[in-house]
Design a protein with these regions (language model features):
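Second-shell loop/turn segments in exported
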Residues: 47, 82-90, 130-137, 145-149, ...
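A short, well-structured edge-of-sheet supersecondary motif
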Residues: 52-85, 116, 308
Length: 350
């Protein structure tokens, strides 16, 4: 999550969340003009005929008034399901996974002490998802705590503290070194939220992070489409990736190829502690454990990616929905059914 319903409750009716949604809630934003774009880009290879499972998954996604993509891979057998899996998407908070991995790699290398405490200053507070902004400045969480909050509650304050500590360019160098060419962290949360104000007046580029925090978000309840234009402009995305790349990134994490065994276990635990369970785990969460990371700007964006710990072995799933014009509950329900479709199909054919 980046933006939450707490913001809407404060009169910021145009925003919601860059993380996910366990509290089956949604907010309303002005729908984008025109239908979602789902066509295969010119020059792309003709996709193979879909399997029955792929056809089912695609039908569910295509029923949504949104740009969508999906990728699933059974780590044990290597079988895959993909629907527009190579289409670049606005990740919103899903990209925080890369920040987490770099933090643990730095810990493994001795560059970061996870037990070290960081005193949160007023200028480090960020609006949107998370709980740290609700506390009085001066709180001193450990870096391990900050990572946990960045993933489990998609805390934006924790995210920017970690980006400042690790270095944004280093996140992208890590992704480059792992051959994830479409996956990028584009900016800080502070710059992302400042950009909303810059749309209204270029002079707002001079606002400090604390001034942006104190202002909150502009009211778009009159339906001007302010937030729609913002989140669909690819130059202003917080993060960028494809369903395939994020799925393979999660596979590498689960296989222990991104960090030490101890760090891998801590990252797995952080994903399992995710508090927003209304998408991928919605219909399968009582059957299997799902370690996942959501990403939202409701109701226009609702993403969920994760590792499904099925009895026969782990399955990675990545679902992106951008430019959604329908209610969030329908989007959440569709992704929940897609996850159930994949789990059911592969559980009976192992």
């Amino acid at each position: 999550m980046l933006l939450t319903r707490t913001s809407a409750a404060l009169g910021l009716t145009a925003l919601a969340a860059i993380a996910g949604c366990k509290r089956r809630e949604s907010s309303a934003l002005t729908p984008p003009a025109g239908p979602p774009t789902t066509a295969t880009p010119a020059g792309s290879p003709t996709p193979a005929a879909p399997t029955s499972l792929e056809a089912t998954v695609q039908a569910r996604l295509d029923s949504l008034p949104a740009q969508s993509s999906f990728y699933a891979r059974d780590i044990r057998t290597g079988r895959e399901v993909e629907v527009r899996a190579d289409q670049p998407m606005n990740t919103v908070s899903v990209i925080k996974l890369a920040v987490m991995v770099l933090a643990y790699r730095d810990a493994d290398a001795g560059r970061l002490r996870l037990s070290e405490r960081h005193r949160i200053r007023p200028e480090e507070m960020r609006q949107g998802s998370g709980v740290l902004r609700m506390f009085t400045p001066g709180l001193e969480p450990t870096y391990r705590d900050l990572i946990t909050q960045m993933i489990a509650t998609s805390d934006n304050t924790a995210t920017d503290i970690l980006i400042a500590r690790l270095g944004l360019p280093r996140v992208n160098r890590l992704l480059d070194s792992l051959d994830f060419r479409e996956t990028r962290l584009r900016m800080t949360i502070g710059n992302l939220f400042r950009g909303v104000w810059v749309q209204l007046d270029s002079a707002n580029a001079r606002l400090t992070d604390r001034q942006v925090y104190d202002r909150g978000f502009p009211d778009d309840s009159t339906g001007t489409g302010l937030y729609l234009r913002y989140v669909t402009d690819s130059t202003r995305w917080f993060g960028r990736s494809t369903a395939r790349e994020i799925g393979l990134f999660l596979e590498q994490l689960e296989l222990g190829r991104l960090a030490s065994e101890a760090s891998t276990e801590e990252m797995r635990r952080a994903l399992l502690n995710q508090v927003w369970d209304t998408r991928l785990p919605q219909r399968i969460g009582e059957r299997v454990s799902v370690g996942h990371k959501t990403g939202d700007w409701e109701p226009q964006i609702g993403n969920d990616v994760g590792i499904v710990f099925a009895p026969g072995g782990p399955i990675v799933m990545a679902a992106f929905t951008n430019a959604n014009t329908g209610p969030m509950w329908k989007l959440n329900a569709a992704l929940g059914k897609v996850a159930e479709d994949v789990l059911n199909a592969w559980s009976t054919t192992r």
